[in-house]
Regions:
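N-terminal compositionally biased, intrinsically disordered segments and leader/signal-like regions
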Residues: 3, 18, 506-507
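Bacterial N-terminal signal peptides
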Residues: 16-29
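Primarily the internal scaffold of c-type cytochrome electron-transfer domains
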Residues: 34-79, 95-124, 128, 145-512
Length: 512
């Protein structure tokens, strides 16, 4: 018997309990040692409440740039007016786990973004201002955090990048504004904006004692938003264009994802950004998964067959941040950004077998930073990194799926018939973009994925007799931009197949 066949009202509670059991199993793919980033299966850590309360308390923002006083321009803005994703994740565990390793969650953390942003501001003598951070750190920009503030001086919600409220507290269409949108301030108790009116919220509020929730600071229980208001644009491609079509000046475009999409077969077929980037299959419009919108205090809320939009936001992003800082992990907030950066995760710190050998004197003791001087602390940090590495593996699989579902390689094709011993060989491959929504590759010209073809021909002994697509000692393709080529220590790759888009400059500087 399927869930769809069970109609009788007296079985609804049983179905919810059954789904919760199944959901607990399904969510385990996001876990390390069978425990989720946020414990939704009654395995709450002893300091669970303390962890959450510390995250969402009314802490005044510190004076950015140093000092212990309060910036007068920020004093009126409590952190609770811009709730953290950690608070949303208490009820929306599945969505939180998907978002935690997404490119949206990575937007503020990305070391590559920070280097690129610093370079652009230096090259423009600072005239770019907050142009980049108003997308990557929108809430931080809105509350007045200086552009140049490092991560360890920013508010938690700014470090979360494109966090829950960045989308679900926006209530008007902005269209092409290069990230200049406005997030509605408000505590966790204020309504959120979604494609529907969320009847599940009304159900929970009506049975607040059963779900043990609160809708105001005066009440006890899990704090939740007091409702959901319909904002249809959030489910349309036009919502995405505010950040994914970027012009740095008149006629100079840094990102043209929207224009590619508007000129695509996908657009003509009515396929939206959400259909491919939040659907069931990464990069393909093949419908959506299903599931309840929330699990509140272990109790399933709403229709278990409800459409589920995947908040992993599938894309080709490749994170290189410290795995203690990304993916977003509530337990990791026990330590500061600076402290995490001193944890050498590339070494076996915190791994039980290695820690045993360390105690037995079998391996030499490193000079641990004071914060990581005890085994217990190192093992706790390693546990968190293990959780995050599982999330990163899921992200890797999604990334591969996006690329494989959007492109195809055929060949080799031999131009002179079948190869013969002792004769020259001519062959080729055909690379096809089968993605109906974007060019290949797509994304920001500064940060888009580099796609090139690495072709190697080996002899019967395994020796390379021909190669194209090799890289120099700096990891760069050997085109005219290769530093090693300019140094004269490597040969130019004459047959390089490279889909990377080069920057264009015009007028006085000429073209490239």
């Amino acid at each position: 018997m399927t869930l769809q066949m069970i109609q009788k009202k007296y079985l609804q509670f049983f179905l919810k309990a059954l789904f919760f059991l199944l959901a607990s199993i399904a969510f385990s793919k996001f876990s390390f040692a069978d425990e989720s980033i946020i414990d939704q299966d009654h395995k709450l850590p002893e300091d669970y409440e303390a962890q959450w309360e510390r995250l969402v308390s009314d802490v005044e923002p510190k004076l950015l740039g140093g000092g212990g006083s309060i910036d007068p321009h920020l004093e009126i803005l409590k952190q609770s007016q811009f709730p953290s994703a950690a608070l949303c994740g208490r009820c929306h565990q599945r969505i939180f786990n998907e978002w935690a390793s997404s490119n949206h969650a990575y937007a503020s953390i990305s070391p590559m973004f920070h280097k690129f942003e610093q370079a652009v501001n230096a090259l423009t003598s600072g005239t770019m201002g907050s142009f980049c951070v108003r997308c990557h750190q929108q809430v931080g920009t809105q509350i007045g955090e200086p552009r140049e503030s490092p991560l360890w001086e920013r508010s938690l919600v700014a470090r979360e990048g494109i966090t829950c409220i960045t989308c679900h507290r926006v209530n008007q269409s902005f269209f092409k504004v290069n990230g200049e949108r406005h997030v509605q301030p408000g505590s966790i108790y204020e309504p959120v904006y979604n494609t529907g009116d969320a009847p599940g919220v009304a159900e929970v509020i009506a049975e607040r004692d059963f779900y043990k929730i609160s809708t105001s600071p005066e009440e006890e229980g899990f704090p939740i938003h007091g409702g959901a208001k319909v904002f249809e644009t959030i489910g349309q491609s036009e919502f995405c264009v505010s950040c994914h079509q970027v012009a740095v000046n008149i006629g100079i475009k840094l990102e043209v994802v929207w224009e590619q999409y508007r000129d695509s077969p996908a657009f003509r077929k009515g396929v939206t950004c959400q259909d491919c980037h939040m659907g069931k299959i990464p990069g393909e419009a093949k419908g959506y998964d299903t599931g309840p919108v929330a699990i509140v205090n272990g109790r399933v809320v709403g229709d278990v067959n409800r459409k589920h939009s995947n908040h992993a936001f599938y894309g080709p992003g490749y994170p290189i941040a410290h795995p203690g800082l990304f993916p977003f992990n509530v337990r990791a907030l026990k330590w500061s950004v600076k402290e995490w950066l001193t944890f050498n995760y590339r070494e076996p710190w915190g791994m039980p077998d290695w820690e045993d050998q360390l105690e037995q004197g079998i391996v030499d003791r490193p000079e641990f930073p004071e914060i990581w001087s005890t085994r217990k602390v190192r093992e706790e940090a390693r546990y968190i990194i293990g959780q995050n590495e599982n999330l990163l593996e899921n992200k890797r699989l999604d990334r591969l799926a996006v690329m494989e579902n959007g492109s195809r390689i055929d060949g080799p094709f031999f131009d002179k018939g079948s190869p013969e011993v002792g004769k020259d060989l001519s062959f080729r491959y055909r690379v096809t973009n089968v993605d109906e929504g974007h060019n290949l590759p797509s994304g920001s010209l500064g940060a888009q994925p580099e796609i090139w073809l690495n072709v190697v021909l080996t002899d019967p002994d395994g020796e390379r007799v021909f190669e194209s697509g090799y890289v120099d000692k700096y990891g760069d393709m050997v085109d005219l931009h290769s530093i090693e080529l300019a140094e004269g220590t490597i040969e130019h790759d004459d047959q390089l197949f490279n889909l990377q888009t080069k920057f264009l400059t015009t007028n006085l500087k000429g073209t490239d």
